[in-house]
Amino acid sequence: MVTQQEKEFLESYPQNCPPDALPGTPGNLDSAQEKALAELRKLLEDAGFIERLDDSTLLRFLRARKFDVQLAKEMFENCEKWRKDYGTDTILQDFHYDEKPLIAKFYPQYYHKTDKDGRPVYFEELGAVNLHEMNKVTSEERMLKNLVWEYESVVQYRLPACSRAAGHLVETSCTIMDLKGISISSAYSVMSYVREASYISQNYYPERMGKFYIINAPFGFSTAFRLFKPFLDPVTVSKIFILGSSYQKELLKQIPAENLPVKFGGKSEVDESKGGLYLSDIGPWRDPKYIGPEGEAPEAFSMK
């Protein structure tokens, strides 16, 4: 079961993925998966949980644990404990990242429009990181708070709006990680943040990666990835693309030219008076046609 408030929210956008989506997603279940879903929900209800028991959420935890019901239950319970301890349920109201306009200059991270499958596209320019300047205006703790803030905004605002725009359930994002200009020292400087961010993503927001493009990858990066591929989950590997400096053609296969920023080979430009590429946050979640009962996505900072 879900709460009445959740029910009204879930009914405001599509709840099934398209038929060609991965097995184990809403609308694409076999009988064994349906049985596992019902079993997991019953176990969690019996344990006293009343929120986040919708099909989409529970199936993400099940997929993350290969439909092992007991392991999925443990993962869900650990996530709920973390949410309570971290204050995740109220972070969109409680946390304000007023230093974001400055941080965007030293570690650009932003969402911009959607890919051909309706996913919000997330850009992270890891090669442009300048930890020395970042440390003058923020801390790793606040950066991680902002990461969780963004995840909650994705779940509560971006994905529902993208689902309405696409006409089917959108559960994942498309990530573009740009390594242009990266050095061993700059990569090492943010390793602690990246490690913690990865832990949060994998354990508390499972199965949110739709496509992952690493562009401007240094020489040897692809070779190293091939060495590790046999140890990675095949489904995860199928979502990851390692590209060098000639990446535009591949990106345009997944992202319409009108949605891909000019700097990455597309045609999308953003007026600096509206925040520019880094701060404008353009997508269906800003379009009144696709905003539902949740309202427009909040801002973590003030543009004033």
Curated annotation (Swiss-Prot):
GO biological process: ascospore formation; Golgi to plasma membrane protein transport; Golgi to vacuole transport; Golgi vesicle budding; negative regulation of phosphatidylcholine biosynthetic process; negative regulation of phosphatidylglycerol biosynthetic process; phosphatidylinositol metabolic process; phospholipid transport
Reactions it catalyzes: a 1,2-diacyl-sn-glycero-3-phospho-(1D-myo-inositol)(in) = a 1,2-diacyl-sn-glycero-3-phospho-(1D-myo-inositol)(out); a 1,2-diacyl-sn-glycero-3-phosphocholine(in) = a 1,2-diacyl-sn-glycero-3-phosphocholine(out)
Recorded GO MF terms: phosphatidylcholine transporter activity; phosphatidylinositol transfer activity
Subcellular localization, as worded in the UniProt entry: Golgi apparatus membrane; Cytoplasm
Membrane disposition: Peripheral membrane protein
Principal place of residence: Golgi
Domain of life the protein comes from: Eukaryota
Residues carrying Phosphoserine: 302
Record's function text: Required for transport of secretory proteins from the Golgi complex. Catalyzes the transfer of phosphatidylinositol (PI) and phosphatidylcholine (PC) between membranes in vitro. Essential for viability and secretion. Exchanges its bound phospholipid with phospholipid monomers that reside in membrane bilayers. Regulates specific trans-Golgi export pathways, like transport from endosomes to the trans-Golgi or transport from the plasma membrane to the vacuole at the level of the endosome.
Protein name: SEC14 cytosolic factor
